[in-house]
From Swiss-Prot:
<keyword id="KW-0234">DNA repair</keyword>
<dbReference type="InterPro" id="IPR011034">
    <property type="entry name" value="Formyl_transferase-like_C_sf"/>
</dbReference>
<dbReference type="GO" id="GO:0006284">
    <property type="term" value="P:base-excision repair"/>
</dbReference>
<dbReference type="Pfam" id="PF02245">
    <property type="entry name" value="Pur_DNA_glyco"/>
</dbReference>
<dbReference type="GO" id="GO:0003677">
    <property type="term" value="F:DNA binding"/>
</dbReference>
<keyword id="KW-0227">DNA damage</keyword>
<protein>
    <recommendedName>
        <fullName>Putative 3-methyladenine DNA glycosylase</fullName>
        <ecNumber>3.2.2.-</ecNumber>
    </recommendedName>
</protein>
<dbReference type="GO" id="GO:0003905">
    <property type="term" value="F:alkylbase DNA N-glycosylase activity"/>
</dbReference>
<dbReference type="InterPro" id="IPR003180">
    <property type="entry name" value="MPG"/>
</dbReference>
<dbReference type="InterPro" id="IPR036995">
    <property type="entry name" value="MPG_sf"/>
</dbReference>
<comment type="similarity">
    <text>Belongs to the DNA glycosylase MPG family.</text>
</comment>
<keyword id="KW-0378">Hydrolase</keyword>
Length: 205
């Protein structure tokens, strides 16, 4: 069942935790790709110095953070790598969840071509290990870039998230500090990174 607006229209930390175990769906090149979300990070603009919208900052880049809950926010790091976020909170309240890791479930052959430009069986163990265990890695595997920024997952067939009743939900959730935000003063110590314990597609234990 596809997640609706009410799922995202809540506290960002709650949404980040509850996205774990849900299935990210991407339709591209006539193929459906699916991955279980195994790692997330929460960002809350008003109080979070790690957020692009800290203190209510609104620019052309950050405007998507203020969009309807369930909207896709894609930004670029290091001038070349993309990161996928899902907007939370009410409209005009800047909150977002960074998707940091997914476990491939369906369409892995197409994912491999997008990620490495070769079939999955040709991949080395190192390439398989680094398939989708990081925000930019999963974007490459799913063919996500700035072109997907602003998509509404509530109605779009390109990208959305679903709750698959067949996926086990009896996992343990680890709470940890977020990654790569040492500049964010006290916010760098917030335990707003969440991941499924012992899942091999988590970017960092």
């Amino acid at each position: 069942m596809r997640l609706g607006r009410d799922f995202y229209n809540r506290d960002t930390v709650t949404v980040a935790k509850e996205l774990l175990g849900k299935v990210l769906v991407r339709n591209i090149n006539g193929v459906t790709l699916k991955g279980k979300i195994v790692e997330t990070e929460a960002y809350i603009g008003a109080i979070d110095k790690a957020s692009h919208a800290y203190g209510g900052k609104r620019t052309n880049r950050t405007e998507t953070l203020y969009a309807d809950p369930g909207t896709v926010y894609v930004y670029i790091i290091y001038g070349m790598y993309h990161c996928l976020n899902l907007i939370s909170e009410e409209k005009d309240v800047a909150g977002g969840v960074l998707i940091r890791g997914i476990e491939p479930l369906e369409g892995i052959e197409e994912m491999s071509k997008l990620r490495y430009k070769k079939s999955y069986e040709e991949l080395s163990n190192y390439e398989k290990k680094n398939f989708s265990n990081g925000p930019s890695k999963l974007c490459m595997a799913l063919g996500i870039d700035k072109g997907e920024n602003g998509i509404n997952t509530i109605s779009s067939e390109e990208i959305y998230v679903e709750d698959d009743s067949l996926i086990k939900k009896d996992f343990s959730i680890v709470e940890a500090k977020r990654i790569g935000i040492d500049y964010a003063e006290e916010a760098r110590d917030f335990l707003w990174r969440f991941y499924i314990k012992d899942n091999k597609f988590v970017s960092k234990k």
